[in-house]
């Protein structure tokens, strides 16, 4: 069983870097870097953990649900993967094209961050929706490995063991996505001071990334959706980079897992330390206000006696 969990964990780590949906990672990173909020680093890292966890929930949850459905007999879902990938690409392409004109469509699936202060960081709901789209685009490339893991789990384990396999698969995806999220947040905090001039162009930069991402996904999935083979050759640029990333992750699975755990614990400790310092900072001015006032009172100059007061005796009569 331990070997099966390790296999599921490794498969989950490889899932986010598949060639079918790998182009969505730059869009997500661009959205995270687009947040120009000048918050302290612990706050930014905490937000990155939340967005990465939400993205993992949408991504791994969608793939796990699809795996359960297909393992139950609904194998027609895998045949719809090319259409899902094509639809995701067209949606991103249209959204980016509209944003290039200067407009911001009010859709439920917000894949961008506005440069306005009121927009704030991406919400967990938006990141989870992004993860669902990421999984839909990655369905065909990642489903073979997931089904192989599910088949072994069904043959060797109970239903509780099957749930443990899915949990290990989700943990593997979380290890990669959380590291990407935290690294992006840390880089964003450092880069914000250097590339502030690009902030006013953030929406158009994000739109350009969405257009390129959508165009790639549509180009990749159109032949498969219409009955042909995918046009992305194994030696293509993005496919080659994805294969290189996959090979590197396979060779460093344990190191990535340990690093992810250390990073999550470090960010959690930094967030707790930041929260414990905030009440002390807010209580300092109120606690020192009375002493400051007392210092002002004790050091206030004495009233200067007037001539009228010096010309009167103790009975109040004039001398």
Curated annotation (Swiss-Prot):
Positions with a binding annotation for Hg(2+): 298-299, 318-319
GO MF entries: metal ion binding
Keywords: Mercuric resistance, Mercury, Metal-binding
Signal peptide: none
Disulfide bonds: none
Protein name, per record: Mercury resistance probable Hg transport protein
Any Gene Ontology biological process: response to mercury ion
């Amino acid at each position: 069983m331990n070997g099966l969990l390790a296999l599921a964990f490794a498969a989950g780590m490889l899932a986010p870097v598949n060639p079918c949906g790998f182009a969505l990672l730059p869009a997500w990173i661009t959205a995270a870097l687009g947040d120009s909020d000048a918050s302290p680093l612990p706050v930014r890292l905490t937000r990155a953990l939340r967005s990465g966890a939400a993205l993992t929930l949408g991504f791994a949850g969608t793939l796990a649900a699809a795996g359960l459905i297909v393992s139950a007999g609904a194998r027609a879902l895998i045949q719809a993967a090319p259409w899902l990938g094509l639809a995701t690409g067209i949606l991103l392409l249209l959204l980016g094209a509209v944003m290039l004109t200067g407009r911001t469509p009010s859709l439920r699936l917000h894949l961008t961050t506005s440069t306005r202060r009121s927009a704030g960081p991406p919400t967990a709901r938006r990141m989870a929706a992004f993860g669902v789209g990421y999984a839909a685009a990655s369905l065909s490339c990642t489903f073979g490995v997931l089904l192989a893991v599910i088949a072994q789990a069904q043959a060797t384990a109970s239903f509780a063991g099957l749930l443990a396999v899915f949990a290990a698969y989700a943990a593997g995806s979380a290890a990669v996505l959380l590291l990407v999220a935290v690294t992006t947040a840390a880089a964003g905090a450092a880069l914000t001071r250097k590339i502030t001039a690009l902030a006013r162009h953030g929406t158009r930069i994000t739109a350009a990334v969405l257009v390129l991402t959508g165009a790639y996904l549509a180009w990749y999935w159109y032949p498969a959706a219409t009955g042909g083979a995918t046009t992305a050759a194994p030696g293509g640029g993005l496919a080659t980079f994805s294969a290189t990333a996959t090979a590197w992750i396979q060779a460093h699975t344990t190191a990535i897992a340990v690093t992810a755990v250390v990073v999550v614990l470090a960010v959690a400790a930094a967030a707790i330390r930041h929260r414990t310092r905030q009440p002390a900072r807010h209580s300092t001015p109120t606690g020192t206000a009375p002493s400051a006032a007392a210092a002002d009172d004790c050091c206030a100059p004495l009233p200067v006696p007037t001539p009228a007061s010096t010309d009167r005796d103790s009975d109040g009569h004039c001398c």
